[in-house]
């Protein structure tokens, strides 16, 4: 909010745009901005497309197809072409980008590659049961369906903005979590900033974790060499801070730089659990915290997404 407050001294809020990658992040930023004394009397509705996702902003600037390709559209396509049924998905799975055909198209587009080009370098197992041949066969009816039904996908929102939209008349553009932006998104952002006096990327090159979808770690590390660094952390205590530094050290060494990460005043503790199947002192501590504190716990995983292993653990422990 500090940078936004500085911008408000020079520009109207109507001419300042903040974009992020998720609705949750955009909503959180909007809520914080609206708490500023300078924003008294400004409504959420007035800020709908002043602080939003990149896709929402691109879509708002377009005339024409507005409806997003939905699960109902997918079911319609599945009746037209049986290849779409090679992988059956529920509506929630479809909305979570679990269908591998649509995932492949999004990843190829995000990396700025054709379907054939992406196949040469991608993890082919990640898109099973589809092959390049089946994906190419499905692409034509998919594109025709979107055209005939006047619907668009998220890639269309970005590309249509790049190809057709007029550069917005704004004074400042701020991009949150900029390191997650893929190839076409960066092109769209540059177009948005054409008339802007100030253009900011906010993010952390060390957190570029979406390279599979087109984000470019090398690009953001080059960009961040002369960036303003935020040194004081507000989340992690000293123990976790030191652990994170050890984990990220190879990245710093690879790019040849050092960063200052100051922890909070909390010391904190680090526990190692070899597995959730065997008792150990760390397991005893974990169970005690789960059962007797109001702390929040996040269980993460590697590989195929599944919550079955942690549900089994909870049942075994009577949680």
What is each stretch, according to the model?
Residues 1-67:
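P-loop NTPase Walker
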Residues 13-15, 38-47, 64-78, 87-94, ...:
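Short, polar/flexible loop-turn hinges at active-site or ligand-entry regions and domain interfaces
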Residues 15, 90-174, 183-188, 201, ...:
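Accessory N-terminal region flanking or inserted into the helicase ATPase core
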Residues 17, 298-300:
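Conserved beta-strand elements of the Class I
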Residues 23, 168, 172, 179-266, ...:
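Conserved helicase motor core of SF1/SF2 NTP-dependent helicases
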Residues 29-43, 216-223, 309-318:
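Short, aromatic/basic amphipathic alpha-helical patches
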Residues 51-58, 174-177, 202:
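Conserved helicase core region in the C-terminal RecA-like lobe
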Residues 268-282:
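Short acidic-hydrophobic, aromatic-tinged amphipathic segments that line or gate anion-handling sites
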